[in-house]
């Protein structure tokens, strides 16, 4: 069956708009990366910073090195130089409409007791970073998610206790990536959970009818 000309035109328009949005997003993320790099250079933190543009957005890694730690060892207490960097970054992140995800990572050094472990530490450090960004003026609703990864995603897997594994990652999401995440968690509770409940109810009714 032939596709109506009007339908084809609408499809082309949608594709063109999508392409323009992707191009605009890539340009904005590139400019954001340049701004972040300038701030890190001025703070003499180039060695602590890595960035890459991925399909989901701009991935910003701020990590420890052998000379400086972002937090006191074994603690979520933030060090002054890292706090200064985050304060400088807050208005930069706020300059775009993009949502962000903040994730904490640790090395593989284990705690001596089970009361507090690397899961707690990585989560508390991510929350500390979020708090500094918000205190510096970044709106609370800019943060879409705060995550703890403990030592599950080591950058240097050959050296699990390496300083470079201790890091904070800030993902600046594209619009499509944040939309996907909203759908994944069922925004407003009616996009994922309710349809599934309705489907199960229908299956139960059909099962009863066939008995």
UniProtKB/Swiss-Prot annotation:
PROSITE patterns linked to this entry: OMPA_2
Recorded GO CC terms: bacterial-type flagellum stator complex
Superkingdom per UniProt: Bacteria
GO BP terms, alphabetized: bacterial-type flagellum-dependent cell motility
Gene3D superfamilies: OmpA-like domain
Transmembrane segments: none
Domain OmpA-like: 58-176
SUPFAM superfamilies hit by this protein: OmpA-like
NCBIfam families recorded: PRK06778.1
Similarity-based family: Belongs to the MotB family.
Name of this chain's protein: Putative truncated flagellar export/assembly protein LafU
Lineage of source species: Bacteria, Pseudomonadati, Pseudomonadota, Gammaproteobacteria, Enterobacterales
